[in-house]
């Protein structure tokens, strides 16, 4: 939790429309939905919403990896998420 608060301070200074901020926002939503779904396993609407958000984040990360690999690596490390699989 402390790591997220430090990251949130960093991202508040950046532009809200940036790819990094959007990925950060989606990551927070994903973590909240994941903890919700651990308690409510049969909440299928939330499961669908989680899958949609995961897809959006995956597309944004793929775009960032293609455009700027250094910023992509930094963001992955800061948010503590795995690198997307490439074909």
Curated annotation (Swiss-Prot):
Its keywords, alphabetically, are: Chloroplast, Plastid, Ribonucleoprotein, Ribosomal protein
Tell me the Gene Ontology biological-process terms attached to this UniProt entry.
Answer: translation
Where is the protein localized?
Plastid, Chloroplast
Top-level taxon: Eukaryota
- Does the keyword Ribonucleoprotein belong to this entry? yes
Pfam family example for this protein?
A: Ribosomal_S15
Gene Ontology CC, one term = ribosome
- Return the SMART domains for the record: Ribosomal_S15
Gene3D superfamilies in the cross-refs: S15/NS1, RNA-binding (1.10.287.10)
Give the GO molecular function terms: structural constituent of ribosome
SUPFAM superfamilies in alphabetical order: S15/NS1 RNA-binding domain
Q: How does it assemble?
A: Part of the 30S ribosomal subunit.
Q: Which PANTHER family does the protein's record reference?
A: RIBOSOMAL PROTEIN S15, BACTERIAL AND ORGANELLAR, SMALL RIBOSOMAL SUBUNIT PROTEIN US15M
Annotated family: Belongs to the universal ribosomal protein uS15 family.
Name of the protein: Small ribosomal subunit protein uS15c
Its ancestry begins with: Eukaryota, Viridiplantae, Streptophyta, Embryophyta, Tracheophyta
